[in-house]
Amino acid sequence: MVRPDTFNTFQYLSDRVDAELKVTLEDRSMPLYEMMRYHLGWNNSANATQIARIHGVTCLTANQNSSGDMNMALPVAAAVELVDNFVQIHDDIQAGNMTRNGRDAVWWVWGPAQAINAGDGMHALARLAMFRLRDRGVPVDITFQALRFLDDAALAMCEGRFQDLEAQERIDITVEDYLTIAGMKKGSLLACACKLGALLSGRGEEVIEAFNSFGTKLGIAMQIGEDIRQVWESDNDSTAPHNEVLNKKKLLPIVYSIQTAEVREKRRLGEIFMKRVLEPADITTVRSILNELDARRYSESLAEDYRSQAVNDLTTLSIIHKKDKSIDQLTSILTKSMPI
């Protein structure tokens, strides 16, 4: 069980990232930026919401565990958070999600075309936020290395998302394929957040690479947890329950089942996922087959394996104090809704 003070620390770091994001946008008044503020949860409407800045907090946690100065790392924490939000806006358009964080999605309020502008604008702002490092006295070479980390991660994430979409019409995706895609789609940006935090602490390649591995594996664990919820739990933010299943996304429980099923079940799953359009009734059939194959337990076990591996990647680093539980606490919070 995660102690209450852990959540207070997480919220403190999230608030610091939020403040840095507001500075990034404070001088921009065009309605385009109001769309961004709305997505970030800042507008003054009655349904404004507080949103956890997961990637920014991860960045600051890595920085603190590398004995860094958090104030120096705030620009990169804001930058990686902006990239994540750019992806969220595009995700909602792509999947047809009408809501995000309990209220109307940006595209549902302003239309897809303007939402694309808002998302792309956030990506540009992320790169500009990086240059605030120079205002804090960070050397040019470190600033440009940080920018390279961010661009590499954004590109890897796009590659993973491309492969994820390509897989929708295929039934020959293996678990190994899935893990590669999840590492790129979900793990690359979280790994980037970790690398940026370590980089801004002045640590060398060994520490940066350890945090890179930590972030990638934690991202995979988070993706598996999201997949489990899509199959077995209702998602209040979706346009319909199990939206990813209806969109024929190859979630881990489905990939595992197709790969390991006997011919009869394999054929039945193939018939469903080769349909042009899936119907809600198909989900009941899919879930029944997955339950027969114990796909949930397999997925939960693999998620926990990746979470444990992520933490273990950092235990050999001499800079990580054994009594400092912030890494364990971070992974617990980020995976708290995983059914493990």
Named regions from a protein language model:
Residues 1-83, 89, 93-108, 161-166, ...:
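Conserved N-terminal diphosphate/IPP-binding helix and adjacent helical/loop segment
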Residues 40, 284-340:
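C-terminal charged capping/lid subdomain of soluble metabolic enzymes
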Residues 47, 100-122, 171-186, 209-213, ...:
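Divalent-cation-assisted or electrostatically stabilized phosphate/pyrophosphate-binding catalytic cores
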Residues 58, 126, 160, 254, ...:
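Residue-level signal for inorganic ion chemistry
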Residues 59, 72-98, 154-155, 187, ...:
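Active-site alpha-helical segments that house and flank conserved acidic catalytic motifs
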Residues 65-69, 129-147, 164-181, 195-211, ...:
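Inter-helical turn/loop segments and adjacent helix faces that build the functional surface
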Residues 113, 117, 153, 157-161:
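Mid-bilayer segments of alpha-helical transmembrane spans in multi-pass integral membrane proteins
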Residues 122-135, 190-197, 215, 273:
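Histidine- and acidic-residue-rich, metal-dependent catalytic cores
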